[in-house]
Regions:
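Noncatalytic, solvent-exposed loop/strand surfaces
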Residues: 1-178
Length: 178
């Protein structure tokens, strides 16, 4: 479902893969895949613009480490070729009541005493009744992403024809395994 205030360009190829589904959950073993499917069912997910929820985790895809945020794009106006590096990384997020976060000593990121090393993946949100725990969507045992590789891709698009010229995985499985 698309919001009328956040439309996609209709004539330019989209970077990224289609929405996640339970059947697309992946693992390096059948147990991994099963545990990822269970985590998927336990979370709230309605596509790319899934809003945060209070009572259960939600899946953010692409996540904070996903999309074309690592290095952005390169464009050659002479030949109209755009090269984009993008990551395929979903996140598994959970809101935490601010009272609980305060009780555990979790500080907001704008506090001078905040330390990412101390807080890890959880941070209280300034002026909010919540903290948020942000994690990659990993399989519980192996800590491998629950979506199928590749986790990094480079895409070349001819902006004159609005067609993908080529698309290749970027990186190796060596650095993504347990």
């Amino acid at each position: 479902m698309r919001s009328p205030t956040q439309p996609w360009s209709v004539d330019i190829p989209r970077l990224g893969f289609s929405d996640l589904t339970e059947s697309k959950m992946w693992g390096i073993s059948p147990i991994d895949q099963m545990l990822c499917r269970i985590k998927y069912r336990q979370a709230y997910y309605v596509g790319e613009f899934t809003p945060p929820t209070v009572n259960k985790p939600w899946i953010q895809y692409p996540g904070f480490n996903g999309g074309s945020d690592w290095g952005s794009i390169a464009y050659n106006p002479k030949n109209g070729i755009l090269i984009a590096n993008w990551s395929n990384t979903p996140m598994y997020n959970q809101l935490v009541a601010r009272a609980k976060a305060d009780q555990e000593g979790i500080l907001p990121m704008d506090d001078p005493k905040f330390s990412a090393k101390k807080n890890g993946s959880i941070a209280a949100m300034a002026e909010s009744p919540y903290a948020v725990n942000v994690q990659p969507f990993y399989a519980p045992i192996t800590n491998v992403l629950c979506n199928e590789p590749p986790y990094g891709v480079v895409t070349a698009i001819n902006m004159n024809t609005k067609k993908v010229i080529w698309q290749k995985p970027l990186g190796t499985a060596e650095h993504n395994g347990p």
